[in-house]
Amino acid sequence: MKSYRSTRSLLADIERVLAENRPSFHHSPLEDIAALLVEGRHYSWVGIYLSVDSNGSTALLEDTHPAHPGQMAVSTTRKKILITMKIAGREIGYLNVESDRENAFGPQERVLLERVAGALAGFLTGRGKYLVRKAAKPTPVPKAAAA
């Protein structure tokens, strides 16, 4: 159920999810972060992307199986915001958030999303490096398909 949560409460839950994360290739904490943001605010979709190579191409790090209704892009999106995830001035990815509300991204929302992006950047360059490695690794082509 969707309910508007305070910034402090939402940030505390996000930091808890990142701190309690155990490396796993079956479940990503990024899915939990996206779900917390969608359920705790008036967002219709949240995407977490990583800059993988020097060409600026990105890979989606959230893999939703099954897709949470709030994590599917909606054609009625009215507002979008991109927040850069940076560590020491180096861009490592971005947080993409969409809302079906007209005035969804006021100053408080921007501060919240910038703090979430900062927490994600710290996580992805620290304890969450396994997610970066997984996203950067090309998927192998099956031998039958290569022939």
Give the location of each predicted region.
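Short beta-strand-to-loop transition segments that serve as allosteric relay/switch motifs
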Residues: 95-103
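Intrinsically disordered, low-complexity terminal regulatory regions
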Residues: 1-60, 126-127, 134-147
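Amphipathic alpha-helical "output/dimerization" segments
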Residues: 105-125, 132
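A short, aliphatic-rich beta-strand micro-motif
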Residues: 78-87
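Allosteric regulatory "coupling" segments in signal-transduction proteins
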Residues: 24, 57-77
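Flexible loop/coil segments at beta-strand boundaries within sensory signal-transduction domains
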Residues: 86-91, 127
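Structural motif
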Residues: 80, 92-94
